[in-house]
């Protein structure tokens, strides 16, 4: 009986360990530096060279500068995508494609105007994942996305809230500059 229990526990540990190497959880350290944007993503290996990833970003914060200027990069973002890894999943170079949706409100970062709206689109990215240990990687990436802005309004400033531009339009933007900590 004792041998059966030990064998069962050993089998579960082996199965769990092998499964854990096919899944990852990561967070973008540079994202946290972007006015405290909370971000998390989870990935799973679909094949030797393909992985699937889902994730999101959330930033409810608004800051006041000493000059009285409000600064914010508020957002709710979700995405799902796949990555192609020429070497092995979660190791080395990769290319990615994703679908993304975002609701945002930002002001005071690059200009005084207030930009609010919702958008969806498709993104392309590339990067390199460096293996630190068996369970920890650092992921470097850069990418962009394009799509459609809907429910979009651009105001002259936060105080006057005079509408400068409104309505749907298309966009292309740099999106992912990431240095992520990945745990497998």
Predicted regions, residues:
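Sec/Tat signal peptide C-region and signal peptidase I cleavage site
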Residues: 15-20
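Predominantly the C-terminal beta-signal and adjacent terminal strand-loop region
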Residues: 133-184
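Residues that define the transmembrane beta-barrel architecture of outer-membrane proteins
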Residues: 21-23, 34-38, 74-78, 116-122, ...
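Sec-dependent signal peptide recognition
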Residues: 2-9
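Gram-negative (and chloroplast) outer-membrane scaffold detector with strong preference
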Residues: 44-140, 180-181
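Outer-membrane beta-barrel domain signature
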Residues: 27-31, 67-71, 111-116, 164-170
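Solvent-exposed loop/turn segments connecting transmembrane beta-strands
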Residues: 24-41, 59, 67
């Amino acid at each position: 009986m004792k041998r059966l229990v030990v064998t069962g526990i050993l089998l579960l540990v082996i199965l769990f360990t092998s499964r854990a190497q096919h899944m990852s959880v990561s967070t973008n350290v540079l994202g946290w530096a972007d006015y405290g944007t909370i971000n998390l993503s989870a990935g799973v290996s679909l094949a030797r060279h393909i992985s699937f990833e889902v994730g999101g970003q959330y930033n409810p914060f608004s800051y006041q500068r000493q000059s009285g200027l409000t600064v914010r990069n508020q957002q709710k973002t979700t995405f799902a995508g796949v990555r192609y890894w020429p070497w092995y999943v979660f190791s080395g170079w990769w290319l990615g494609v994703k679908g993304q949706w975002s609701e945002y409100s930002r002001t005071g970062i690059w200009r005084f105007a207030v930009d609010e709206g919702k958008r969806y689109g498709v993104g392309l990215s590339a990067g390199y994942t460096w293996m630190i240990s068996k369970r920890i990687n650092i992921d470097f990436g850069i990418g962009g996305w394009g799509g459609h802005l809907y429910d979009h309004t651009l105001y002259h400033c936060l105080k006057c809230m005079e509408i400068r531009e409104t309505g749907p339009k298309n966009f292309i933007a740099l999106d992912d500059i990431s240095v992520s900590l990945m745990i497998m």
